[in-house]
Design a protein with these regions (language model features):
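Detector for methionine-enriched segments
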Residues: 1, 58-60, 74, 96, ...
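Intrinsically disordered, low-complexity
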Residues: 1-45, 115, 132-145
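Generic serine detector
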Residues: 6, 18, 23, 30-31, ...
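Catalytic cysteine-centered active-site loop
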Residues: 38-90
Length: 145
């Protein structure tokens, strides 16, 4: 089940495996949510929305794993969803601020430089896993419902 999308993302290409470190703290859903999101890697847009679909992708993954999601197509809606955690944890939702809008994805690990690795929809027009600058993320939220 893979598909394609339309664009957002300043994330770099996935680094070599030797540069990736697993997060020291696994979070709620670190297998279920991450595994579900990974099924869509490399594919296009599985959401049916023609643009700005990162939040729609996040809601879809949450619903497929038994969570309610926010029901919003706005990435910023996830800044009030679940329980805030202090830093990147596997399974946490990362909310990013960006000029002209925001972006949201699920944390899968931390790279050797300490940057979170995240799966997100609408990253270079597809579902992608890539490190992002930790300074771009303003909220880490653990799903609780």
């Amino acid at each position: 089940m893979q598909a394609g999308g339309s664009g957002e993302a300043n994330a770099a290409a996935i680094p070599a495996a030797s540069n990736i470190e697993a997060s020291a703290t696994g979070g709620f859903g670190s297998s279920g949510i991450v595994d579900t999101a990974r099924r869509y890697l490399g594919g296009g847009n599985p959401t049916g929305r023609s643009s700005l679909w990162c939040a729609r992708f996040m809601n879809m993954v949450l619903q497929q794993t038994g969570h309610r999601g926010t029901g919003s197509d706005m990435a910023s809606s996830f800044a009030k969803y679940g329980t805030r955690v202090s830093g990147p944890q596997v399974g946490a939702i990362a909310v990013m601020g960006r000029r002209g809008g925001g972006h949201v994805g699920i944390i899968t690990g931390v790279d050797a430089r300490g940057n979170p690795i995240m799966i997100s929809g609408n990253s270079s027009h597809r579902v992608r896993e890539a490190p992002v600058s930790r300074g771009q993320i303003y909220a880490y939220m653990m799903p609780t419902n």
